[in-house]
Amino acid sequence: MCDQTFLAITFGPCDKCSENKPLMNIYLKNEPINYCSLCVEMMACQGLAKGETVQSLKAESESLKAKLEEERAKLHDVELHQVAEKMEALGQFVMKTRRTLKGHGNKVLCMDWCRDKRRIVSSSQDGKVIVWDAYTTNKEHAVTMPCTWVMACAYAPSGCAVACGGLDNKCSVYPLSLDKNENLASKKKSVAMHTNYLSSCSFTKSDMQILTSSGDGTCALWDVESGQLLQSFHGHSADVLSLDLAPSETGSTFVSGGCDKKANVWDMRSGQNVQSFETHDSDINSVKYYPSGDAFASGSDDATCRLYDLRADREVAIYSKDSIIFGASSVDFSLSGRLLFAGYNDYNINVWDVLKGTRVAILFGHENRVSTVRVSPDGTAFCSGSWDNTLRIWA
């Protein structure tokens, strides 16, 4: 039986019957093969004839998972905070709101920084996507989407375009111009199409490709110019809520988190799920790579944030307190990686010492749940978005 099936359809000769037909890209014992639908059905029937039922395959999968956890446990001999015991504690943490961006008519759901360290794009439940000047708080561009709940937005690396999407199941790209009165909607390009809502999007190293995640349980890589699907990523068993690309110097991988409580690491070239972590007790709302690319953090509805070391292949730290009972909606690292900023559903932002596992500050100001937190490209400030309809710049 095949161990993973991809729904992406291509056209060409079937590897089994050699006829030119629509093909399903599947993996058999980790080897990619292209079979037509008839040959896939025949292969499934042959598997059933051998006694390979869904139940037996599930049991085999659970057995392999248990063995994997046993091997991981053998290497779990020390916690991160124990290693960092002798490190000097951080000094007094002072950060406050420097700017408040007002203009959305409903909950702010997502935001992203431009690489120029000055401009911000944000999206909201009101269906609007706004480009801001973070220095002056002025709005530079505004687009009204054809749907409400625009849950994803991203700035292109060049700063010349923004991408966004939500309940329309699409990822749309809008080129930006110097003319602030130009109608951006007329230049909209629909790049990606999922079968459920778009939860997150991110450009790769250039403006030419974009990565998306969706409520249909998949992630996908698209060509922006043609709108062609380049690679699909299947491995989550529920909605995918967040994704993050590895720092460019560490290779072509990304991490995703979802409602199945899993955080998966993917190889963008092969489409393979190369690592998987399942230690949260509820939905994973946010994932973010450590600046070096050797680890990543996650924030979950179980009221914890966690750190996973990719080289050790295990969880190495949990950031939580008994007094925190609301879920973490968004996480991001400081430029050095020493601090972890986490937005919570109790309206607060907690700042954690990544190495020692202690909380160094609580930032108050928002009047509803914090939905997104992003550190600026130069690390001098960070922006938070909230269901109170505002964004705040902290420094």
UniProtKB/Swiss-Prot annotation:
One of its GO terms (cellular component) is heterotrimeric G-protein complex. The keyword Membrane applies. WD repeats lie at residues 103-142, 145-184, 193-234, 235-276, 279-318, 320-362, 365-395. It comes from the Eukaryota. The keyword Repeat applies. Disruption phenotype: No visible phenotype; due to the redundancy with gnb5a. Simultaneous knockout of gnb5a and gnb5b results in no striking dysmorphologic features, but the larvae show impaired swimming activity, remain small, and generally die 7-14 days post fertilization (dpf), most likely as a result of their inability to feed. One of its GO terms (molecular function) is signaling receptor complex adaptor activity. GO terms for biological process: G protein-coupled dopamine receptor signaling pathway. It is found in: Membrane. Keywords: Membrane, Repeat, Transducer, WD repeat. Its main location: membrane. PANTHER family: GUANINE NUCLEOTIDE-BINDING PROTEIN BETA G PROTEIN BETA (PTHR19850). Enhances GTPase-activating protein (GAP) activity of regulator of G protein signaling (RGS) proteins, such as RGS7 and RGS9, hence involved in the termination of the signaling initiated by the G protein coupled receptors (GPCRs) by accelerating the GTP hydrolysis on the G-alpha subunits, thereby promoting their inactivation. Increases RGS7 GTPase-activating protein (GAP) activity, thereby regulating mood and cognition. Increases RGS9 GTPase-activating protein (GAP) activity, hence contributes to the deactivation of G protein signaling initiated by D(2) dopamine receptors. May interact with RGS9; this interaction stabilizes both proteins and increases RGS9 GTPase-activating protein (GAP) activity, hence accelerating the deactivation of D(2) dopamine receptor-mediated signaling. Belongs to the WD repeat G protein beta family. This is Guanine nucleotide-binding protein subunit beta-5b. It comes from Danio rerio (Zebrafish).
